Curated annotation (Swiss-Prot):
Lineage, uppermost ranks: Bacteria, Bacillati, Bacillota, Bacilli, Bacillales
Bilayer-crossing regions: none
Positions of L-homocysteine binding: I420, G421, S422, E473, D588
Domain of life of the native organism: Bacteria
Cofactor mode of binding and number, as noted: Binds 1 zinc ion per subunit.
Protein encoded by which gene: metE
Record's protein name: 5-methyltetrahydropteroyltriglutamate--homocysteine methyltransferase
Enzyme class: transferase
Catalytic activity as recorded in UniProt: 5-methyltetrahydropteroyltri-L-glutamate + L-homocysteine = tetrahydropteroyltri-L-glutamate + L-methionine
Similarity section: Belongs to the vitamin-B12 independent methionine synthase family.
Species, as recorded: Staphylococcus haemolyticus (strain JCSC1435)
Length: 749
């Protein structure tokens, strides 16, 4: 009979209560020294390893843990260091500077990890000298062994690593070939240290481009085979279906497949005989990306099916558990809903229940989880009726007519300036919000504080000279969680944190029921801010696509239905702001690109649904109300036409780390709506120079009509320090003023 063992692909770095984030940020703020940081991080790594061992995993991953990002770790391992940072000792401080930038150099680009809300640091190949630096992966493997944890190393594979890179004169194949001897050196050291197998992550092999990479993929793994490493390697895929027949033909010991997000195709290939049954099948059967409890009976049946096609099966999550919170243990949720949830440790418990059932005929834990799932499923969360057809999905007039009405109302100057929405969330801001949520201060005291911060920042913006202002979003912990707290159908957890990028953690709400707007969400603060200035203040909302993509979505209702329910709720808030006299309303969609399916066959429907939902949320307003949107952290080339179809009066896009790449996208489309391409990187503490901002503006104006162009930072300023914000915005405004003066001088008399 086929043996069943358990494994994991990766575990959350943050810690139950964000201990990882707090330690790293304390080091950045010089509140602790490097020795104390190392101790705190070592303690957390130890806790993670032992916690996974506690759930009886047969093999625990090492190499998934990182001080910032595992792709950046791989870059440093192989000396793929940006030219501007070369010549320094390869250590954690270098890692942080590459990721965040410093006063002398800009940070490396930050891009979404496939279709998730995690972000990786893009490796740069310009003028690099690849070699193996200190093998941190070996250190972590040996550390796990010292704790008596049976571990397997995890490393991103050469095909995926090169695909996620940029720069350099070499071809794709040449870069892979350059890395192969370095991978061999690292892998051999791990095998020599006793690694039973090594998880080689190759998620790029589930994308449309995977067929184009088959030749170089075979060359790479043939190389490892000739080095005697083949039996120790497991090619791990996730997030979509893979070409099982091709991957099974490679000389490796095992193949990891996603049986949750593959739309059923991986199972069909297995049943068709495409899997080489002499290899180990690493079956991703527990959802690594969502927080709902597994249908444990369905998983049992899936394993029984797979047993007919593989001699050895390892059951595991469908992807790294990096994308879900650590544990439900510290939550105080309504039991009827909590029974339907499963965070990282609960997912490991589900694996343990299945392992016990199959290997030991022990059904106690399985029966308990099955009963719990059935109790949750017996409830009904579909209670509301919606009339989607009653809300318009197009504006009353085309953009040229709307622009005339808006220009007449707003009286904005040439190259209008604005920010994206948020201002620094200082320790004081966070303390007041926490004290209010925990009922340590009154509503009146909290509202008085919010009004004082709003007033202070309205004055700061006026003094700097910005043209369209914002209230600062001091009442919001997160741009999605805030709406999750106020819309019906959402659940907000207490400790449900996940890593977004670097030390930035978000707490995605859980959508469990029908979504409904019940009262104004943002009107009070926005109207107060507008009362303090004659300049327009933007209403700040998050769009339906982003709210859905940055939440843990329900799975009992089609995705499009949930998205449109959210759109109707946002439409209600847009109208409430307009009725209150707000002239400019921004509906952010930073996650529109991130949700794009990895397979192009699904793109058209996804984008059509996304555009429809955005227009459902924004089309009820009058022509003179200016609708803005914002997008960030993404590669936009694939969706540039959909961006245009949103028909937003103004879109601001995060581009500072890859400005040239985005400008190229506009060469293929005559973009005839308002647009601001972010002119400096807010993720870095570095203050931009006037020359840098002027260059960014000039480059943009080569492709974009000046009358349509806005000047703004590339993202919200929530994570920056107050002085950094003031200094950077002052440089921005001063640069624009000089551009205006120069343009006026060049106009014919």
């Amino acid at each position: 009979m086929t043996t069943i063992t358990t494994s994991n692909l990766g575990f959350p770095r943050l810690g139950r209560k964000r201990e990882w984030k707090k330690a790293i940020e304390s080091y950045w703020a010089k509140k602790i020294d490097k020795a104390e940081l190392d101790q705190k991080i070592s303690d957390l790594h130890r806790e993670n390893l032992l916690l996974q061992k506690h759930y009886n995993l047969d093999s625990v991953p090492v190499g998934d843990f990182s001080l910032y990002d595992h792709i950046l770790d791989t870059s440093l391992l192989f000396n793929i260091i940006p030219e501007r940072f070369q010549g320094r000792e390869v250590n954690d401080d270098l890692l942080f500077d590459i990721a965040r930038g410093n006063k002398e150099h800009v940070a490396s680009a930050l891009i979404k990890w496939f279709n998730t809300n995690y972000h990786y640091i893009v490796p740069e190949w310009d003028n690099v000298e690849p070699k193996v630096n200190h093998n941190v992966l070996l250190d972590r493997f040996n550390y796990a062994k010292s704790l008596n944890v049976n571990a397997h190393p995890v490393i991103v594979g050469p095909i995926t690593f090169v695909k996620l890179s940029k720069g350099g004169h070499q071809s794709f194949e040449e870069k892979v070939q350059t890395l192969l001897p370095l991978y061999k050196e690292v892998l051999q050291a791990l095998v020599d240290a006793g690694a039973e197998y090594i998880q080689v992550d190759e998620p790029v092999l589930v994308t449309d481009e995977s067929e184009a990479y088959e030749a170089i993929t075979r060359e790479a793994y043939d190389y490892f085979d000739k080095a005697g490493l083949a039996d120790k390697l497991v090619i791990q895929t996730y997030f979509e279906r893979a070409n099982v027949k091709f991957l099974s033909s490679l000389p490796v010991g095992g193949l990891g497949l996603d049986f949750v997000h593959d739309n059923g195709y991986n199972l069909k290939q297995i049943e068709s005989g495409d899997f080489d049954s002499s290899k180990t099948l690493y079956a991703g059967i527990i959802d690594g990306r969502n927080v709902w409890a597994a249908d444990i009976e369905a998983k049992k049946k899936l394993i029984e099916t797979l047993q007919g096609h593989a001699k050895h099966i390892v059951i595991q999550p469908s992807s790294s558990l990096l994308h879900v919170p650590v544990s439900l243990d510290d939550e105080t949720l309504e039991q009827s809903i909590e029974e339907g949830l499963s965070f990282a440790t609960e997912k490991l418990d589900e694996l343990d229940a299945l392992r016990r059932l199959f290997n030991q005929n022990d059904s106690a834990k399985y029966d308990k989880l099955k009963a719990r799932y059935e109790r949750f499923q017996s409830q009904s969360f579909k209670n509301l009726e919606y009339d989607f057809d009653s809300v318009p999905t197009s504006r009353k007039s085309p953009f040229p007519e709307r622009k005339k009405a808006q220009d007449a109302r707003l009286h904005l100057p040439d190259l209008p300036t604005t920010t994206i929405g948020s201002f620094p969330q200082t320790q004081e801001v966070r303390k007041y919000r926490a004290d209010w949520k925990n009922k340590r201060i009154s509503d009146e005291a909290y509202n008085n504080f919010l009004e004082s911060e709003i007033a202070r920042w309205i004055k700061i913006q006026e003094d700097i000279g910005l043209d369209v202002l914002v209230h600062g979003e001091f009442e919001r912990n997160d741009m999605v969680e805030f709406f999750g707290e106020k819309l019906q159908g959402f659940l907000v957890t207490k400790f449900g944190w996940v890593q977004s990028y670097g030390s930035r953690a978000v707490k995605p709400p859980v959508i469990y029921g029908d979504v409904k707007w019940t009262e104004p969400l943002t009107v009070k603060e926005t109207v107060y801010a507008q009362s303090l200035t004659d300049k327009p203040v933007k209403g700040m909302l998050t769009g339906p696509v982003t709210i859905l993509n940055w939440s843990f979505e329900r799975v009992d209702v089609p995705r499009k239905v949930v998205q449109d329910q959210i759109a109707l709720a946002i439409d209600e808030e847009v109208l409430a702001l307009e009725e209150a006299g707000i002239k400019v309303i921004q509906v952010d969609e930073p996650a529109l690109r991130e949700g794009l399916p990895l397979r192009s066959e699904y793109h058209e429907q996804y984008l059509a649904d996304a555009v429809n939902s955005f227009k459902l949320a924004t089309s009820s307003v009058q022509d003179e109300t200016q609708i803005h949107t914002h997008m960030c952290y993404s590669q936009f080339g694939q969706i540039i036409h959909a961006i245009h179809e949103l028909d937003a009066d103004v879109i601001s896009i995060e581009t500072s780390r890859s400005h040239g790449d985005l400008i190229k996208d506009f060469e293929d489309i005559n973009y005839d709506l308002g647009i601001g391409l972010g002119v400096y990187d807010i993720h870095s503490p570095r203050i931009p120079t006037e020359d840098e901002i002027a260059t960014a503006i000039d480059r943009s104006l080569q492709q974009i009509d000046r009358s349509l162009f806005w000047v703004n930072p590339d993202c919200g300023l929530k994570t920056r320090k107050e002085d950094e914000v003031k200094d950077a915005l002052t440089v921005l405004v001063n640069t624009v003023r000089k551009k205006r003066a120069s343009n006026n001088q060049n106009k014919p008399a």
